[in-house]
A protein has these predicted regions:
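Short alpha-helical elements
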Residues: 1-206
Length: 206
């Protein structure tokens, strides 16, 4: 089995790319054509998020790991990922496919050991969220729990697992205190304007 087949198992389909491409931020001005396509780099980001591995382990078929990480980091800082999600929500709402029976839950992600004190000679991700101390600001979404450094994602999703809102907290944060905040973060703009929809028909939680 080739590495291409393994890497491409869950890449974007042509139909998904056709839906996604018009929503992406505009690229740089005309110049030397990029070595890797946006589709390659985005598939690389998606692969890395699914696999949960260091950026350096992203398969070469997606481009250099530095290019994959650079796109992720640039769009994260610019708020582009959140804007893309909102645009997809708008299209889904206009098509009437959002199921407003909403489920609220959370999942914990273990952080890499370098997350709270990365070395500065990595050639790429050299800027840690904080110093090597035990303290992490609340807005970094990183804290110590029984499993070590972890982050917790609190989500509200519809029946088809379509994300409607997400909050990131430190891993030791409880679910109940975030319940209202997760629901209050639901806001799906309407395609033709008007007030965004924020109220589910029903909420499921445990």
């Amino acid at each position: 089995m080739t590495s291409v087949a393994v890497a491409g198992r869950a890449d974007l389909t042509d139909a998904q790319w056709a839906r996604l491409e018009p929503l992406l931020p505009c690229g740089k001005k005309a110049g030397r054509p990029p070595k890797w396509t946006k589709r390659q780099l985005i598939d690389g980001i998606r692969w890395r998020c699914r696999a949960g591995v260091p950026w350096r382990d992203v398969p070469a078929e997606y481009g250099s790991w530095q290019a994959v990480y650079a796109l992720f980091r640039r769009w994260q800082r610019a708020g582009s990922w959140a804007a893309i999600v909102t645009s997809l929500q708008v299209l889904a709402d206009a098509a009437g496919v959002i199921d407003w029976q909403v489920s609220v839950d959370s999942t914990t992600a273990r952080a890499h050991p370098h997350a709270a004190g990365a070395r500065h000679d990595s050639g790429g991700q050299g800027e840690p969220p904080a110093g090597p101390s035990e303290y992490e600001p609340a807005d970094h979404g990183l804290g110590r729990s029984r499993g070590g450094w972890t982050s917790k994602l609190h989500l509200a999703c519809d029946r088809d697992c379509r994300v409607l809102s997400v909050l990131v907290t430190a891993g030791q944060a409880g679910d109940s205190p975030q319940f209202t905040a997760v629901l209050d973060s639901i806001s799906v703009p309407r395609l033709g304007g008007g007030r965004a929809r924020a109220r589910p028909d029903r909420v499921l939680a445990d």
